[in-house]
A protein has these predicted regions:
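Acidic, proline/glycine-enriched N-terminal capping motif
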Residues: 1-175
Length: 175
C-alpha cells in the first residue's frame, strides 16, 4: 500500500512534467514547537511521531545520520524511496543547495515556514541526502506549487503555500 503511494507520487511527478520536483505526503508538523517534556526527557510530540510513522520511520537522529524504520515489509520508509529522485535533482548542483518548498496544508491553520521545513531537512540529513542542514550546505526558500521562486518585482504574484484537505504534503525542488 505505501509503496503504491510512493509509485503514484513518482507517476504524479511525471504527469505534471515536473521531473525536477518531488512530493512528500502528509501534513508536515513543526519539529521545534512539537516537543513534550517529561520526567524522562524531551520527546517529539504525538503529532510528529504520527507523521514519522505514516512515512515508515520509527525514529531518526540527524546528528548521527541514523534512521530506524520498521521491519515489516508492508511499512517501507517512504523517505528512503525518494532517494533516487532527490539524487537526480541534486546532480550537478554544488553547495549550498537552494531548496524550494511548497507546503500543501490540510487546513487553513497558520504555520511557521521555517519550523515546518526543519523536520524535512533533518530527515534529509539523517538519510544522508544532504551533508548537513546548516547554511554552508542548504538554504530553504518558499516557492509556488509550480516550482517558481518569488519574483522581486511582485513577491505576492502567487501563493507560497496551498490548502488541500485530501492531499497534504510538501513539494520540493532544488535550485
Amino acid at each position: 500500500m505505501i509503496q503504491e503511494q510512493v509509485n503514484s507520487i513518482i507517476v504524479l511527478n511525471k504527469r505534471k512534467e515536473v521531473n525536477d520536483m518531488m512530493f512528500i505526503p502528509g501534513n508536515i508538523p513543526s519539529l521545534k514547537n512539537s516537543k513534550v517534556k517529561t520526567s524522562r526527557g524531551i520527546f517529539s510530540s504525538p503529532t510528529v511521531s504520527k507523521f514519522l510513522r505514516s512515512i515508515g520511520i520509527q525514529g531518526f537522529n540527524s546528528r548521527k545520520k541514523t534512521v530506524k524504520g520498521y521491519v515489516d515489509p508492508t511499512r517501507p520508509n517512504q523517505f528512503e524511496a525518494l532517494r533516487s529522485v532527490f539524487m537526480a535533482m541534486k546532480y550537478g548542483k554544488g553547495d549550498p543547495l537552494v531548496i524550494g518548498y511548497h507546503q500543501v496544508r490540510n487546513s487553513k491553520r497558520l504555520f511557521d515556514f521555517s519550523n515546518s521545513v526543519e523536520i524535512i531537512q533533518d530527515l534529509m540529513t539523517a538519510h544522508d541526502f544532504i551533508e548537513d542542514d546548516n547554511v554552508k550546505h542548504v538554504f530553504p526558500v518558499p516557492m509556488s506549487k509550480e516550482g517558481l521562486l518569488i519574483n522581486p518585482d511582485d513577491p505576492r504574484a502567487f501563493p507560497l503555500y496551498s490548502v488541500d484537505k485530501e492531499n497534504p504534503g510538501v513539494w520540493i525542488k532544488l535550485f
